[in-house]
Amino acid sequence: MQKAELITAIVTPFNDRDEIDYGVMQRLVDHLIAEGTDGFVVGATTGEGPTLSHPEKITLYTRFADMVHGRALVIANSGSNNTKETAAFTHEVGGIAGIDATLVVVPYYNKPDQNGMIAHYTAVAAAAQKPIVIYNIPGRTGVDMLPATVATLAQNPMIQGIKQCGSLPALSDIIDRTKHDAFNVWTGEDAQALNIKTLGGMGVISVAAHLYAHSIREMYAALDRGDITTVAALQRQLLPKMAALFHFPSPAPTKAALNALGFQVGSPRLPLLPLNASQQQELAHLLGVPELSAIEAEVLA
């Protein structure tokens, strides 16, 4: 699996008929690659994967891989809380040309223990055609994969990374336990985009990169050259903006901002709602601009 340190968890654009808008998706992909994104997660949380049908996912993944055309890493969501279905779908998605890896979430609702998690991922890995990236997000699943469990699964050659959402101590522990070339650790928390690099991880799977990929790239470049003054300044600028994109249920804030920028990604599907006028104004305030369209000056500069 190719290396990627700034991965965008990309939204799924919908048109007025609530169908996937592939024209907008192509524009957004090209823009994000130009801004410094070197990877994508498609059809996952930010991409509203739970609202996509099986045929929609297969078509989306196939067309998305064609859009990227080898210019960036492509990780497609294939996980669920049903082991047999996850194994079958992971196998199917792995057969799509241009898909580099699959994202498999820790089973939600069922709430397995650590041994159950190991059994789940072992079964899915046995069916996989492409590398698997674990997705540990306790706030959405109700269970937390422990660092020791991650280390056990990292020994499986088909399991080559993790998107880890949670505390910094857990993130650091996972990095320390999985120090070998075939396993990549990404944070799924935008606010940890800097921390993950200083801890020796690969990078961030980001929502904020839709708007601030260039600034995150600039921060990473400053870190690489030891310019801590610039790193600190960029981190201070980015943190409140990153938090703002989760002030309302995600990805509604990101979609509202992208719509204001001219990327007509539409509304989220139910049960999520688009931001109303008052919420859009509040989001603009949190992003530090008088109205959402005003972010164009810093995002598209």
Swiss-Prot record:
Annotated site residue numbers, Part of a proton relay during catalysis: 45, 109
Annotated binding of pyruvate, by residue: 46, 205
Stretches that traverse the bilayer: none
Pathway where it operates: Amino-acid biosynthesis; L-lysine biosynthesis via DAP pathway; (S)-tetrahydrodipicolinate from L-aspartate: step 3/4
Domain of life: Bacteria
Any GO BP annotation: diaminopimelate biosynthetic process
Keyword set includes NAD: no
Reaction equation(s) it catalyzes: L-aspartate 4-semialdehyde + pyruvate = (2S,4S)-4-hydroxy-2,3,4,5-tetrahydrodipicolinate + H2O + H(+)
Entries under PROSITE patterns matching the protein: DHDPS_2 (PS00666)
Enzyme Commission (EC) number: 4.3.3.7
Family statement: Belongs to the DapA family.
Protein name: 4-hydroxy-tetrahydrodipicolinate synthase
